[in-house]
C-alpha cells in the first residue's frame, strides 16, 4: 500500500480492506452498544473491559500490517546491471548453511533477488522474505510487517471468539425476550463473527504452522524445500521468538520528503550594499573617532567587477581632496609651473581611491565618494583669497595637517589666542605695542612670501619624486628653494637652523623687519602644510650644537620702541621667563618632555628674545614673578593644553609626532610659541635697557625638506 501512492488510483484494491475494516469496527460497536451493558449486570463488569482491550489490540495490528513497509528493495538504475557486454544469467547460486540456494534475476528491479525474496505482482516490488500479498490489508506481507500480520490474525481470532461467546451468553440470559431489540442485534453480531471466524481461524492456524517450521507462505506454496532441508529454520521455539521478539528489520526505502527550494548564490557575489550610513573607526594620531558618511552602490562597482584573472586596470587618479593644504600650495605655484597642474596627477596606490576621508569628529559633514577626483585649476586659485585674509586676522594656530576642510573637526581650524609661555594663563600675558606690530608683520609676510616662493612647488615635486635624499640636504643650491631665496632682496639671512616645525616661515622674520607695523583687521585662516621629523641626519644635529654656541657669543640686537597706539590691539606678546610664573600645565608637560628634569633653580636661556635681566614690562603687564624653569619643550605644547576653548581631542590632534632623539635636539636649540619663534611675540624693552640679542647674522644655507619644510644649516 505505501508503494501505491505514486501510481494510478484503483478503487478495486481498497474494497477488501474497506470491507474488513467496516465489519470489524461495525460489529464491535454494536456489541459494545447492545450486548455489553446487559453482560456487565448479569455476568461481570470485566466483560466489557476485556473486549475493549482485545478490540484495540486487533485494530492496532491491523493498522500496522496495512500501512507499514514490508521490506521493499529499491530498484536498481538502468546501467547498474551492465557488468558485461552479454546478458546476465537468469540465476545465481549461493550457499547457506551448506545448502545451495538459487537467486533469480529480477528483470523489473534489475538485480538478483536475495534468498527468500520475491517480486510481488500486485505491488510490483521485490519484498524481502516475501510471504504473500494480503488483499484484506491491501499490502504485501514481508519481513518487516509479518509480525504484526501474525499478531493481527491471533488477536482477531480471539476477538471473534470473545464476541461470539459473550453474545451467546447474553441470548441465553434473555431467551424469553428474543423479539427484543437488544437480543436481535446481539444475534446479528454473532452471525457476522461466526461467519468470519472460520476463515480467520483457518488462516491463523496455517501461519502458526509456518512460523513453527520457519517457512513463509511463498515457500510453502511453491514447495521450494519440499523433500529437502530448510536452511532458514532454527527450531520451533527460535522460529517463534524470531517472529515475535526480534528487532525490526531495517528500511531500505527513504521516506518521501517534500522538496525544499533553496536559492544558491555563487561565492563570488557579494551581498548588496544599501545606501545607508557606514560607521568607520579611524585612528588620527592617537585620536579615536567615528566617521559617518554615505556610500553609494556605484562606488563599489569597480572593485566588485574586477576578477583575479582579468588584466590589471590602469592606475587610478589620486584623490587630492584629502590634502587640502597640498592643493592650496600647488595652486599658488601655478604661475611658475602650470604644467604640473594642467595634466592629471601621477598614479597613486589604489587604496587612496576608495579610501574614505577621515575625520576626528563624528558630526563632520559627509562628502560624496567621488568628490574632487582631480585637482582643478579653479579650486586652487581660490585659495590665495583666504591667505590674503590671514594677514588681516591675527591668530595663533598649531602646525597644520593635510586633512580636507570638510572632514576637519569643527574646532580644529579655529583661532585661539593664548600666551605661549604662561601655559594658558591669560592674566599673566603681556600686551605690547611693539610686539604686536612685530607679530603682525610676520603674519603679513605669509601673503608676500607664499605667492613668490617656490617652497610649495618643491613640496609638489617631492610628492611626485618621493622622499628627500641625503645629497639634497648637503647641496641646497640644486633645490628650487635655494634659488628663490637668493633671488630675494634679503642681504642678511638669519643665523642658525630652522626647525621643521616652522614649515616655510623663515620669511616671516625677514618680512617683519620691512613691515614692522600693520593694523590687524580680523581672524586668520591659513592652510596647513605637513610636518615631518624623521629625516634629521648627524650633520644637522651637529649644526644645532654649533648654532647654540653662536647664540651664546652673539651680541645683543637693538629692539624698536613700543608703539602706544597698538598697546591694546588684541594680540598677546610673548613674555620673558621672568615676567609671569608658569601654571600647573607646564609641570604636566615637563613629565612628558625628556628635558623636563631641569633643576628649578636654573633659569631658562632665551633663544629669540631678550635676556632675563634685560626684559622690561609692557604697558599694562603684571608684576614680574619668580623665574620659571626651562622645561626644554616647545611652548605650543603647554599653551594648548591650558586653553579653555581647546579640548583634549584637539590637543592630541595638534601635536605632531616627534621622536625622543630629535625632540631633545630641537628643543635645546630654541623654544617656539605655537609654531612661531619667541622673537615674534617678545615684549619690547623699557627705556634705558640694552637691546636684545638676535641670532639673525651670519651665513646660512636653506634646504627644502620632506613635506615642504625648510631647513636652515649654519655655515
Swiss-Prot record:
Subcellular location: Cell membrane
Modified residues (Phosphotyrosine): 91
Annotated Pfam families: DHHC
Protein name: Palmitoyltransferase ZDHHC5
Extracellular side: 35-38, 170-191
Chief location of this protein within or outside the cell: membrane
Gene name as annotated: ZDHHC5
UniProt-recorded Gene Ontology molecular function terms: palmitoyltransferase activity; protein-cysteine S-palmitoyltransferase activity
Active-site residues, Swiss-Prot/TrEMBL: 134
